[in-house]
Amino acid sequence: MLLGLGGRWAAGLWPGRTRTTWCVAAALRGSGIAFWRAASLAEPERLRSGGHLALAESCGPPGRAQIPVCWEQCVRCFHTQVDKPENGRLIYTGNLARTIFGVKCFSYSTSVVSLAFLPYLLSQNNMMFGSLPLQVLFYGVMGSFTVITPTLLHLLTKGYVIRLYHEATSDTYRAVTYNVMLSETSTVFHQDDVTIPESAHIFTSFYAKTKSLLVNPALFLNPEDYNHLMGYDKPFTFDMEEVDEKKLHEGEK
């Protein structure tokens, strides 16, 4: 084993006094954990003559200790797949998922705090606010922070797609979104179920059956996946009957 590290290192160590310790460096790559290198560390011993420590010499350039290239292939990596195989291939990941989650958590927390202080405020109503307009204004502001704001946030962000998977064999998609309880919910639909709104909507990119979903075309890992999702890769058909009907209606007007 010492001969694999170099003859000069093996000659500098006392016979029978070598201790080899194996360590594996774990590196996080992508969604798995890979074992890449195994290093052999030898305990330095004093030489018989000089009394100095024997330095380990590398297989590469002088003055830089490194592991031989042949050792890098000793330990093969194993990959832990995060996404389940039945989910399909991940084609889209939303970059605002954490932001939406944090904003909704903050809104829910303020609502809970407001509801917790509501009994105390009701008991101190006459002492704090003497006039009726001030009471109406105060409770209106509290109601907006307690009920209206979380509801509005949910209505605006319920269609935001966190992740989108595509199953090529059945041409089905699985869109992951947040529900009202901030847990992930899935919507499975076929490509034929995708309809594009006639007019542009701020919070709707397309409809999957009857549910509106919002995606950012620039965040797709492959632009062809977005084109296939929206049906842009289908051949264009020009129906002459529809054109004749439109001309007929325009002539009647």
Curated annotation (Swiss-Prot):
SS bond list: none
Annotated InterPro entries: TMEM70, TMEM70/TMEM186/TMEM223
Purpose: Scaffold protein that participates in the c-ring assembly of mitochondrial ATP synthase (F(1)F(0) ATP synthase or complex V) by facilitating the membrane insertion and oligomer formation of the subunit c/ATP5MC1 through its interaction. Therefore, participates in the early stage of mitochondrial ATP synthase biogenesis and also protects subunit c/ATP5MC1 against intramitochondrial proteolysis. In addition, binds the mitochondrial proton-transporting ATP synthase complexes I and may play a role in the stability of its membrane-bound subassemblies.
Membrane-spanning residues: 100-120, 136-156
Organism: Mus musculus (Mouse)
GO cellular component: mitochondrial inner membrane; mitochondrial membrane; mitochondrion
Keyword Membrane attributed: yes
Protein name as catalogued: Transmembrane protein 70, mitochondrial
Residue ranges, Mitochondrial matrix side: 78-99, 157-253
Domain of life: Eukaryota
Stated family: Belongs to the TMEM70 family.
Complex formation: Homooligomer. Interacts (homooligomer form) with ATP5MC1; this interaction facilitates the oligomer formation of subunit c/ATP5MC1 (c-ring) and the c-ring membrane insertion and also protects ATP5MC1 against intramitochondrial proteolysis. Interacts with the core subunits TMEM126B, NDUFAF1, ECSIT and ACAD9 of the MCIA complex. Interacts with ATP5MC3, TMEM242 and TIMMDC1.
Localization terms from the record: Mitochondrion inner membrane
Reported phenotype of the disruption mutant: Homozygous knockout mice for Tmem70 are embryonically lethal at about 9.5 days post coitum and exhibit profound growth retardation. Embryos exhibit delayed development of the cardiovascular system and a disturbed heart mitochondrial ultrastructure, with concentric or irregular cristae structures.
Tissue: Higher expressed in the heart than in the liver (at protein level).
Taxonomic lineage of the native organism: Eukaryota, Metazoa, Chordata, Craniata, Vertebrata
Residue range covered by the transit peptide: 1-77
PANTHER family in UniProt: TRANSMEMBRANE PROTEIN 70, MITOCHONDRIAL
Record-linked Pfam families: TMEM70 (PF06979)
